[in-house]
Amino acid sequence: MTAYGGEMTKERRKITVGLLFGGRSAEHEVSRASAANILRALNSDRYDVYLIGISRDGRWFACDSGNGAGTGSTALTISDEAPEIGLVPGGRGRLVHCDGPTGSDAGSIDVAFPILHGPNGEDGTVQGALELADVSFVGSSVTGSAVAMDKEVSKRLMRDAGLPVVPFLTTTASSRIEYAAAVAALGTPDLFVKPANLGSSVGVSRARSEEEFAASCALAFRYDRKILVEQALNGAREIECSVLEESTGDIRASGLGEIVRASEHGFYSYQAKYIDADGAALHIPADLPLLQARRLQELAVEVFNVLCCEGMARVDFFVQGDEVFVNEANTLPGFTSSSMYPKLWEASGLSQTDLMDKLIAHAFARHERRRALSFG
């Protein structure tokens, strides 16, 4: 692999994949771990990889193995001593240096693979930059990314489409709701409080009293100016489904998996997901009646379409007896060694290497369809 755009082989030129990771987000560390796993999964006979690390303050760096990244790493690193680079608008993947001889050539990429979780990466911001650069990229475009990232907007769209969602309300930093009003509106004193635009359970907590609610809101407002308050579902099972869009536009759902958290964790928190090795178990396939499992797969595809997702998404559900609720869709799901999205496809017969090929093929096909549109 090379840091700057790859080399020509005698037989054919490899595809240069720009792997974007890190980011200005509370999910920065998760992104670095996801990127390491994707780097291992990409077929080195087919792809050269241009590692683009985005620092916590939003700067882009050209990273290579000398900066601590590599196929044996559990998480890729970003050195602020690496060359700082930028993507050229309309440049079809061309990159330039932003330090030293500013504007000098820094190579190019054929396709971008943004594995950026949370704000400033999963919310349509980077997708907009990639569209302006006129380069193919993996995953949803601006609309689907922005819609799925905002929990309030996505839940309203799903509810309006007749999809089952958990009762919720939103509150903002400028018009905060009191605990008593939230209890009255949602019909229960047992509530979950979440930042509206974040994932990986960052900033999420449970509240069963006025004091806990105040603390939960204070925590969530550290990460977002809008927060979601949801009715807690006691005893609900957490079921997940991976959705993949082929280059032809065909959409299919994987088999289902279940998250079974350890008893000491009150819910599937960031700690349970990424810190505690025994925080949760992944059961694949999920033990569900056949008809219910098929219904969840159908719902996952419906959610994918309603939220304008493209390429891939992981759709999460709550199952309480015969009742099913859609929790959310993640347009850039985790790709760590313990992440459900790639594991579900592996269990469905699609290896991670083949999954990478399909995601990249979709990126190229979607870009060609977009370029065929008239903008004049």
From Swiss-Prot:
Cofactor(s), by name: Mg(2+); Mn(2+)
GO cellular component, as recorded: cytosol
Residues holding Mg(2+) 1: D316, E328
InterPro entries xref list: ATP-grasp, ATP_grasp_subdomain_1, D-Ala_lig_Van_CS, D_ala_D_ala, Dala_Dala_lig_C, Dala_Dala_lig_N, PreATP-grasp_dom_sf
Catalytic activity: 2 D-alanine + ATP = D-alanyl-D-alanine + ADP + phosphate + H(+)
Function comment: Cell wall formation.
NCBIfam families xrefs: D_ala_D_alaTIGR, PRK01966.1-4
The protein, known as: D-alanine--D-alanine ligase B
Organism: Bradyrhizobium diazoefficiens (strain JCM 10833 / BCRC 13528 / IAM 13628 / NBRC 14792 / USDA 110)
Lineage: Bacteria, Pseudomonadati, Pseudomonadota, Alphaproteobacteria, Hyphomicrobiales
Gene encoding the protein: ddlA
